[in-house]
């Protein structure tokens, strides 16, 4: 699930994904892509 959070590497997406109620994420096309629970 893409969220509107810009990133440079996947480590930056851990907290935004948790804040969005999802598990973890990776950085794709400079945006965070989270895995739903």
From Swiss-Prot:
Primary subcellular site in the record, as a coarse category: secreted
Region described as Interaction with Ca(2+)-activated K(+) channels: spans on this chain: 25-32
Gene Ontology CC annotation, any one: extracellular region
Gene Ontology molecular function: ion channel inhibitor activity; potassium channel regulator activity; toxin activity
Keyword Secreted: yes
Presence of the UniProt keyword Secreted in the record: yes
Pfam families: Toxin_2
Tissue: Expressed by the venom gland.
Alphabetized UniProt keyword annotations: Disulfide bond, Ion channel impairing toxin, Neurotoxin, Potassium channel impairing toxin, Secreted, Toxin
Xref: InterPro entries: Scorpion_toxin-like_sf, Scorpion_toxinS_K_inh
Disulfide bonds: 7-27, 13-32, 17-34
Location of the protein in the cell: Secreted
UniProt note: domains: Has the structural arrangement of an alpha-helix connected to antiparallel beta-sheets by disulfide bonds (CS-alpha/beta).
Family of the protein in this entry: Belongs to the short scorpion toxin superfamily. Potassium channel inhibitor family. Alpha-KTx 03 subfamily.
Function, as annotated: Binds and inhibits potassium channels. Intracerebroventricular injection into mice induces paralyzing symptoms followed by death. Its binding affinity to rat brain synaptosomes is 5-fold lower than this of KTX 1.
Protein name (record): Potassium channel toxin alpha-KTx 3.9
Lineage of origin: Eukaryota, Metazoa, Ecdysozoa, Arthropoda, Chelicerata
GN (gene name): KTX3
């Amino acid at each position: 699930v893409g969220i509107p959070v810009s990133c440079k590497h996947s480590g930056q997406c851990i907290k935004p994904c948790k804040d969005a109620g999802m598990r973890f994420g990776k950085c794709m096309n400079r945006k965070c892509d989270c895995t739903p629970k």
